[in-house]
Amino acid sequence: MRREAGTWAIVILSIMSMCVLLSRSTRGMPMFARKYGVPCSTCHTSAPRLNETGYRFRAAGFRMPEEIGSASEEAFDILDYLSARVQFRTGATRSKVGRLTTTNHQTLVQALELYPFTGAWGGHFSSDIKITFFPVSSPPAAIENLYGKFNTGSQRRFFSARAGFFHPYDGYGAADGPATISRPLFQTTPANSNQSTFFQSWGFDEGGAEIGFDAGHTSIRAAVLSGLVINKEGEKFSATAGVLAKPSAGPTYGAPDFQIFVNHVLQPEGGGLAFHYYHGNLALPIAGTSNFFRNDFDRAAIYASYPLNQHLQLFGAYQYGRDHTSSHAAFSSAGTFVEAAVPVKRMTSAGLRFDWFDPARPKAGNEINGVTAYVNAWFFSQLRIVAEYQHKRTKREPLPMQTDDAFQLRVIYIK
């Protein structure tokens, strides 16, 4: 086991060092880079993480805030609204439960992502479309974004409204997309007292409508969302949402979900505060019967981040959740993460994140904790390499603890 751990460490350090040494300056999302002729660092700290310029560019409908209400004087070019990205993945995992150890090695095409007709149209309207194909996954395709947006106002204060299907929220700093592959555990793990509640604060792209207001360094968003539906294949239940949601196996209550998201920029290179609140409802199966019960649930999270200096940026967050069991008893869940990231070169960073999540606070011995080390490197204009190692421990009392180790390397090319 020590020899395996040493081999893993050598491989990880070698790949991370190679990524850092090869990294070069790069350009941004190609369709926006082509349109504005700017480098990627104009909008990103370590992509996909945004700085304040990039965040406001997205909030203003893929235009600079001062361009709201002004039609572009440049000739229309369809290539300014089209991009594509392909992801390759290789990795190895090892899982240990008691004395049983299993390993897996895999190399594959992870995803093909298309961004057709994404950008600003005139001075007020914009659209965002993202279609992802998964060659070896089920379902084989997902429509992650498919919405139209309207902005009006001035550079300092503007309103927005969008409708369609979109990612759960647009965060900044600690609430933004991570610079590594995996997200914090509390964003991607459902609460679970005696059964899964299925909802995750990230991972389901729902349909809905959202209104927003940006003033200075603060933005507020309120959304009404379609929520999730429970599906059943054989004896297994799952949840889907969005454009390609499957037919519901249980009742639908006709009550939409509701979300509020607030961002405040403290520092232009990723320092900020964010608050997220989500209220939803979902029909969950009652074990041993063909019946369902309604789970009214809530999630509330606060995020904070700040660059202490040019060589260290800190991120952290805490989320609290409340759900119900089939006996209508309420239970809570909670999770947190802290992360330290070190900028190595422009657009290239290395980091370490600690995660903790308790899917049911009243229940003893079921916590999950993990440590994730990563390097996020960009080079040769549009090529990104992400190397990640994660060690995770899951308590399952009275069963033995489960320990998972995973190394993953992503090679991502965007055009």
Predicted stretch roles:
Residues 75-81, 90-111, 239, 243-248, ...:
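Surface-exposed strand-loop-strand hairpins of Gram-negative outer-membrane beta-barrel proteins
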Residues 37-47:
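The canonical Cys-X-X-Cys-His
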Residues 72-75, 120-122, 149-154, 215-217, ...:
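Outer-membrane beta-barrel proteins
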Residues 39, 377, 382-383, 403-415:
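Outer-membrane beta-barrel "beta-signal"
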Residues 87-91, 132-134, 166-168, 223-227, ...:
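Outer-membrane beta-barrel pore domains and translocons
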Residues 253-255, 260-360:
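Detector for outer-membrane/organellar transmembrane beta-barrel domains
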Residues 51-52, 82-92, 102-230, 254, ...:
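Outer membrane beta-barrel
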